[in-house]
A protein has these predicted regions:
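Charged, low-complexity intrinsically disordered terminal segments
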Residues: 1-204
Length: 204
């Protein structure tokens, strides 16, 4: 699985594309890759529809026959020791407990959040997410898509062309090739950039 999310009790969750290693987290190098993370929380703990959907998704993955527990050395004791070392090194990160007002100032209210996923079985999958994306684009004038990489099938090219021909402006934001960490995604974009642009989308 390539999912990256952190559920905090029944309060909220962080969802993003950032890998949990030193290339993406912390300040261990002079420069490191930045990625987008979303903090989502609700007024009523555990009641938001997207929060409930993410929890259900976690249990769906966790309970699949192909999954098994990882036998980590050290157990919870090693994790607690690591936490203490972090507190010693970065005490300022633990000095302040944020209030409800702090969170409200730092965030914005949404009209709703939906989490979509393809089938989770470890086998060839139907492109459920793509079909939902195309359906959501119907009748819209301005469409913004953010994705790390863009590798299209023949049908995806056809779908994008169809959306643009109906008058929609489609802007797609991808990772910079110069700093991308997925060589296959970067190379495919460079090879197919002209073909992508010929569908009518604007890519950045």
């Amino acid at each position: 699985m390539h999912d990256k999310y952190l559920i905090a009790d029944d309060w909220g969750y962080i969802l993003g594309g950032r890998n949990t290693d030193n290339r993406f987290l912390g300040y261990y190098k002079e420069s490191y890759n930045e990625d987008r993370d979303l903090l989502v929380y609700g007024e009523k703990p555990g009641q938001g529809s997207s929060f409930q959907a993410l929890e259900a998704y976690f249990h769906e993955i966790w309970n699949q026959p192909c999954c098994k527990e990882f036998d980590a050395k050290g157990g919870i004791g090693g994790l607690e020791q690591c936490c203490e070392r972090v507190k010693e090194r970065y005490p300022e990160a633990f000095d302040r407990i944020y209030s409800k007002e702090d969170w409200e100032k730092a965030t914005m209210e949404t009209r709703g959040i939906e989490l979509w996923t393809n089938p989770t079985e470890p086998e060839n999958k139907e492109p459920v997410v793509w079909e939902r994306m195309i359906a959501a684009m119907e009748g819209e004038e301005d469409i913004l898509v953010q994705t790390p990489y863009m590798i299209c099938s023949r049908k995806m090219y056809e779908d994008l062309r169809s959306v643009c021909e109906k008058g929609a402006r489609v802007d797609i934001v991808i990772n910079a090739v110069e700093s991308g960490t997925n060589p296959f995604g970067c190379i495919d974009y460079l090879n197919q950039k002209k073909k992508i642009c010929q569908t009518g989308v604007h890519i950045y």
